[in-house]
Amino acid sequence: MKFLILALCFAAASALSADQISTVQASFDKVKGDPVGILYAVFKADPSIMAKFTQFAGKDLESIKGTAPFEIHANRIVGFFSKIIGELPNIEADVNTFVASHKPRGVTHDQLNNFRAGFVSYMKAHTDFAGAEAAWGATLDTFFGMIFSKM
């Protein structure tokens, strides 16, 4: 059964076309230099995500946005996401790393869906997302589908 799930995950990641991958990478290149803005959008979309981080729990998002700890954490998250985008379609190891660190923390599917929504909202506001929406949809469906199958 585990082999079947692994095979399906690999097939899903491999199903991304070269054009989809190129489109996603090009649009992400336009925003990856704003990790604080991306993390802010995600936390704003779902404060329960921010509450999962002990250094931010119970704090006002507006007051921590410009702080060094927030910037450091934003760089980590967006850096990891940059790694995933750069390695498309070969993301199985990154998915395993993500699941290994997030499953024990009790991260829910709803929170991951809300992370996705916050990220997409940021992309729509900062890029020509309409031209990349189908490629992003396929990529995010693949990424989160792989995660959900393991969590």
Swiss-Prot record:
Give one GO term, molecular function aspect: oxygen carrier activity
Q: Which Pfam families match?
A: Globin
Q: Which keywords does the record carry?
A: Heme, Iron, Metal-binding, Oxygen transport, Signal, Transport
Keyword Disulfide bond (UniProt): no
Please list the residues that bind heme b. Answer: 73, 102
Instruction: Give the source's domain of life in one word.
Output: Eukaryota
Which is a Gene Ontology cellular component entry for this protein? Answer: extracellular region
UniProt entry tagged with the keyword Signal: yes
- Please list which residues make up the signal peptide: 1-15
* Domain Globin as annotated: residue spans: 16-151
UniProt xrefs under SUPFAM superfamilies: Globin-like (SSF46458)
Q: What else is known?
A: There are at least 12 different components in Midge globin. The sequence of genes B and B' are shown.
The UniProt similarity line reads: Belongs to the globin family.
Assembly and oligomerization = Monomer.
Protein name in the entry = Globin CTT-III
> What is the scientific name of the source organism?
Chironomus thummi thummi
- Specify the taxonomic lineage: Eukaryota, Metazoa, Ecdysozoa, Arthropoda, Hexapoda
